[in-house]
Swiss-Prot record:
Gene Ontology molecular function: any one: unfolded protein binding
Species the sequence originates in: Chromohalobacter salexigens (strain ATCC BAA-138 / DSM 3043 / CIP 106854 / NCIMB 13768 / 1H11)
A family per Pfam: HSP70
Induction: By stress conditions e.g. heat shock.
Name by which UniProt lists this protein: Chaperone protein DnaK
Length: 644
């Protein structure tokens, strides 16, 4: 078996490392640099340039020079953030046939994984030149908050580059591996704050000695997949554009050549201000008007830059609070803080993080290289070269299905250790129902519509039977890469259907970030909605039971009693169309009372009618029968047959 290399496929820069004699080593590229810009350019003579060569010619070829492509992976063209990106980048973002966001270069549409594959090829060749042998296997890192679609797309990029991706590993987890491998033995809880070029992650990780084995267990992870160094650059670019406009009256934002020069200058100034208190952005001949050429010359102080980006830094602290809360820890219980990603070199970022955790971050972890080093170590673990290391990562978002009334029923909760498999038994909601729909969701909202649909599929040809009798086993299988497989099986016939969540149905970066924020902001709203749905389900169940009792009673019920029950049914059905919980409860109580005497009468003749009546419907889906049986399409029910 050949070497398994470790690749940090970054938004701004990428890095490759190998395990050499038990130690991880970052490999220099052909230009002698340890990191490679994640930039790809297509020239007029048909050549594809990657890395520094592509970056050097960007000013003269802006429309065919692609950067920050990682931020497009898993996105739909119509997403708000993609529409915003279209206005900010000099190249063309186009809509693919399936609605995804692709790029267009010289009349050809390219998928983000295709473009990312060019960077991976460069990393692959860098490793091959160093090792003197072919490399076919790799561990590739992704932001911890990447969704299923983005992980799939990253694997696709690896395959296009000629690499078998042995494992997708989360960037903060990889950094923890790099940190923990050469440290003294002992249990520690560390926080990895990863602010890269395009994404932000925070992971709380416990490093422990367990029977002589170093165990890295992720306790919680959180993040923002649309926050990174690119956003810091944009803030400074906007400031420079405004300054130039106020001085000259000319707006540079529509000039792609000028904006490309500004982007380079802003990035350079931002980096300089991490060490200096002031720098000068000097761009001669930036544009021209009837009076002649115009030059841009703006002094920028560190204080000015910090005032421009302070809100961005502050935005990174909310996920930190959530991650600590999910891990059940306080900031004072964190033993070490590790900073990862080039943007963490900014003094303001270091100060805010130190203030938040109450301690300075370690300085012995290289923020640009730690992730690739960790990926190489994981490659060594998979290849058997590294012993006594166990990595326990987690899934960042809850996975579940839609249940009765539009509620999301979780199967795998967020921060569950992966790989994992969860099964639950569902049943039919209606008599003689022959099919159920399994609607797979990802997110933190109770209301299904507030989460992202990952896909749906039907299990058909269920033998006709009374409601609640068929048993349909739904299985969620989440692998070590965080990629999901879902299957549904009719236990009586053995008939099975399954779905692998594909990239075209995945979440966008903005959607993931937004759904977590929405969940926190709408917690009370969600609770009220859930209670209303449960009450409606109880009402539906009571209506079903009352009608069935009337039907079975036949001529044994007198006309006045029958009319009273039918009136109560109509009033309850009308009440459930509204949102007034008290009104629904009153009508439910009225029907319960009206049908109580009749049900008691019938109980002696038909012992199981009362239990049947207590069951609740599950839309097209399902109903819980026993401890592990819940409404297939829709709602869980307790053993006492009452809706939760």
């Amino acid at each position: 078996m050949g070497r398994i290399i470790g690749i940090d496929l970054g938004t701004t820069n990428s890095c490759v490392a190998i395990l050499d004699g038990g130690n991880a080593k970052v490999i220099e590229n052909a230009e002698g640099a340890r990191t490679t810009p994640s930039i790809i350019a297509y020239t007029d003579d048909g050549e594809t340039l990657v890395g520094q060569a592509a970056k050097r010619q960007a000013v003269t070829n802006p429309s065919n020079t692609l950067y920050a492509i990682k931020r497009l992976i898993g996105r739909k063209f119509k997403d708000d953030v993609v529409q915003k990106d279209i206005k900010m980048v000099p190249y063309t973002i186009a809509e693919a046939d399936n609605g995804d966001a692709w790029v267009e270069v010289k009349g050809n549409k390219l998928a983000p994984p295709q473009v990312s594959a060019e960077v991976l090829k460069k990393m692959k060749k860098t490793a091959e030149d160093y090792l003197g042998e072919e490399v076919t296997e790799a561990v590739i890192t992704v932001p911890a908050y990447f969704n299923d679609s983005q992980r799939q797309a990253t694997k696709d990029a690896g395959r296009i580059a000629g690499l078998e991706v042995k494992r997708i590993i989360n960037e903060p987890t990889a950094a923890a591996l790099a940190y923990g491998m050469d440290k003294a033995r002992g249990d520690k809880t560390i926080a990895v704050y990863d602010l890269g070029g395009g994404t932000f992650d925070i992971s709380i990780i416990e490093v422990a000695d367990v029977d002589g084995e170093t165990q890295f267990e992720v306790l919680a992870t959180n993040g923002d997949t649309f926050l990174g160094g690119e956003d810091f650059d944009l803030k400074l670019i906007d400031y420079l554009v405004q300054q130039f406009k106020s001085d000259s009256g000319i707006d540079l934002s529509g000039d792609s050549l000028a904006m490309q020069r500004l982007k380079e200058a802003a990035e350079k100034a931002k980096i300089e201000l991490s060490a200096a208190q002031q720098t000068e952005v000097n761009l001669p001949y930036i544009t021209a008007d009837n009076t002649g050429p115009k030059h841009l010359n703006v002094k920028v102080t560190r204080a000015k830059l910090e005032s421009l980006v302070e809100e961005l830094v502050q935005n990174s602290l909310a996920p930190c609070k959530t991650a600590l809360s999910d891990a059940g820890l306080s900031a004072s219980e964190i033993d070490e803080v590790i900073l990862v990603g080039g943007q963490t070199r900014m003094p303001l970022v270091q100060k805010k993080v130190a203030d938040f955790f109450g301690k300075d971050a370690r300085k012995d972890v290289n923020p640009d290289e730690a992730v690739a080093v960790g990926a190489a170590i994981q490659g060594g673990v998979l290849g058997g070269d590294v012993k006594d290391v166990l990595l326990l990562d987690v899934t960042p978002l809850t996975l579940g299905i839609e249940t009765l009334g539009g509620v999301m029923t979780p199967l795998i909760e967020k921060n569950t250790t992966i790989p994992t498999k969860k099964t639950q038994v569902f049943s039919t909601a209606d008599d003689n129902q022959t099919a159920v729909t399994i609607h797979v969701l990802q997110g933190e909202r109770k209301q299904s519509s507030g989460n992202k649909s990952l896909g749906r599929f039907d299990l058909a040809d269920i033998p006709p039977a009374p409601r609640g009798v068929p048993q349909i086993e739904v299985a969620f299988d989440l692998d070590a890469n965080g990629i999901l497989n879902v299957s549904a099986k009719d236990k009586a016939t053995g008939k099975e259907q399954s779905i692998v969540i594909k990239a075209s149905g995945g979440l966008s970066d903005e959607e993931i970030d937004q759904m977590v924020k929405d969940a926190e902001a709408h917690e009370a709203e969600d609770k009220k909605f859930e209670e209303l749905v449960q009450l409606r389900n109880q009402a539906d169940g009571m209506v079903h039971a009352a009608r069935k009792t009337l039907e079975e009673a036949g001529d044994k019920v007198d006309a006045s009693e029958k009319e009273q029950i039918e009136t109560a049914i109509s009033e309850l059905e009308e009440a459930t169309k509204g949102d007034d919980q008290e009104h629904i409860q009153a009508k439910l109580d009225a029907l319960t009372e009206a049908s109580g005497n009749l049900a008691q009468k019938m109980y002696a003749e038909q012992g199981d009618a009362g239990a049947e009546g207590g069951e609740q419907p599950a839309g097209d889906g399902a109903q819980k029968k026993e401890d592990d049986v819940v409404d297939a399409e829709y709602e869980e029910v307790n053993d006492d047959q009452k809706k939760q």
